[in-house]
Amino acid sequence: MFWTRYAGASILLFFMLIRLGQLYPRNDMNNFGCEECKLKENNIFSKPGAPVYQCMGCCFSRAYPTPLRSKKTMLVPKNITSEATCCVAKEVKRVLVNDVKLVNHTDCHCSTCYYHKS
């Protein structure tokens, strides 16, 4: 008799948890608070009739334990390996705004993070 109640309560709890999970929106919580990689107007350098755009937004990054065979080949062994892609300009156009040479981004994509390279 006890096991029947226990099994029934477990099944009821399971279905309640499934229902609760369905109430939340199905968006990617990894990028919460960070928009996708796209062009946005730069308010500092833009002038009326001459907007200046730059790439802004998030791409992916992850970290994981370094495999032992990779660790053996490193000059300075590290326990954690990380990978990342950054929001960078795919195409650019050089412009002159108030005698300042600027690079106006015309297209964006997620690619290698150059500032991480050393």
UniProtKB/Swiss-Prot annotation:
Listed A to Z, the keywords are: Disulfide bond, Glycoprotein, Hormone, Secreted, Signal
Does the entry feature the keyword Chloroplast, yes or no?
Answer: no
Q: Which InterPro entries match?
A: Cystine-knot_cytokine, Glyco_hormone
Entry's PROSITE patterns? GLYCO_HORMONE_ALPHA_1, GLYCO_HORMONE_ALPHA_2, GLYCO_HORMONE_ALPHA_3
Localization in the cell: Secreted
An example Gene Ontology cellular component term from the record?
A: extracellular space
**Pfam families registered for this protein in UniProt:** Hormone_6
Q: Does the keyword Lipid metabolism apply?
A: no
Task of the protein? Involved in gametogenesis and steroidogenesis.
**Quaternary state and interactors:** Heterodimer of an alpha and a beta chain.
Please give the family membership noted in the entry: Belongs to the glycoprotein hormones subunit alpha family.
- Its recorded name reads Glycoprotein hormones alpha chain 1
